[in-house]
């Protein structure tokens, strides 16, 4: 689903969002609120957000395996739910922070850990972890967590999926494997046939970069044609003059304006279909 060219990581050399020492200390203590982009840009803030707002969950799959993740709860329930799927690196504090942000917006948000606690420090490690994941086991993990969210005692029963890069492809895979109410894909692999898309029942929102050489116009165009052939008309594809991983504030490909626009569209999409 990913390779070292498109998903390889180079740290951002852009100026970080301004935050004072006082704001930083207050946020880490859970006494202040900062914009999501600011939290994601600072590892210490992302770590604090994930630690303060999420708790681990572990659920047995039908085959006897384990589906793991971290859940963030909203103040008001019952609430709709969102399943977040990480990039090829593994589950990190940034994704946990996004889960915390969704909880602030009124969702039960669960960030899945598809690698069972492992996290890659470089592209070679990420590729190894990705290749070690059995597709059948990965699908079972996600279906198990989606079913768990639907039946959670504080859930309305509605579920949306969202993923980035590796997770974007898995967001689509999960929605094909089991019914959900909304699917969001950030520059994920979408090379599916009409037959493979036959069981997809949710509306789909996709975010893609025109400079992305892997998840490119040919692949996305083929996806649009396959969706049409399968009779799936509720698809919104958005293009940004940006590269792969443009929504990751810690990477060199980060595009602040496009990331903000994609996030605005994502939250509006979930509000429309889940709330």
Show the residue positions of the predicted features:
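N-terminal secretory signal peptides
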Residues: 1-22
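N-terminal export signals
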Residues: 19-46
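N-terminal cap/lid segment of alpha/beta-hydrolase-fold proteins
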Residues: 45-74
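Short beta-strand element of the alpha/beta-hydrolase
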Residues: 79-87
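Alpha/beta-hydrolase active-site loop
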Residues: 129-151
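Primarily recognizes the serine-hydrolase "nucleophile elbow" in alpha/beta-hydrolase
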Residues: 147-152, 156-199
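Short beta-strand/loop motif that positions the catalytic acidic residue
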Residues: 206-208
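C-terminal catalytic histidine-bearing segment of alpha/beta-hydrolase fold enzymes
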Residues: 230-275
């Amino acid at each position: 689903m990913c390779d070292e060219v498109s998903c390889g990581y180079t740290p951002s050399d852009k100026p970080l969002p301004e935050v004072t020492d006082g704001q930083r200390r207050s946020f880490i203590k859970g006494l202040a609120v900062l914009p999501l982009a600011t939290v994601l840009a600072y590892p210490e803030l992302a770590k604090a957000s994930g630690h303060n707002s999420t708790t681990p969950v572990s659920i047995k799959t039908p085959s006897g395996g384990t589906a793991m993740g971290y859940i963030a709860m909203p103040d008001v329930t019952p609430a709709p739910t969102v399943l977040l799927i990480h990039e090829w690196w593994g589950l990190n504090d940034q994704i946990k922070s996004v889960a915390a942000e969704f909880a602030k917006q009124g969702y039960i948000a669960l960030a899945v850990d598809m690698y069972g606690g492992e996290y890659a420090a470089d592209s070679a490690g990420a590729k190894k972890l990705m290749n070690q994941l059995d597709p059948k086991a990965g699908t079972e993990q996600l279906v198990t967590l989606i079913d768990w969210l639907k039946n959670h005692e504080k859930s309305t029963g509605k579920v949306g999926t969202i993923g980035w890069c590796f997770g974007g492809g898995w967001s689509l895979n999960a929605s094909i494997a089991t019914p959900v109410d909304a699917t969001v894909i950030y520059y994920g692999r979408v090379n599916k046939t009409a037959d493979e898309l036959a069981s997809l029942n949710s509306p789909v929102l996709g975010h893609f970069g025109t400079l992305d050489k892997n998840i490119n116009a040919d692949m996305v165009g083929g996806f649009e044609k396959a969706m049409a052939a399968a009779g799936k008309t509720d698809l919104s594809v958005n293009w940004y003059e940006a590269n792969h991983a443009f929504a990751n504030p810690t990477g060199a490909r980060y595009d602040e304006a496009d990331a903000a626009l994609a996030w605005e569209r994502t939250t509006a999409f979930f509000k429309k279909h889940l709330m």
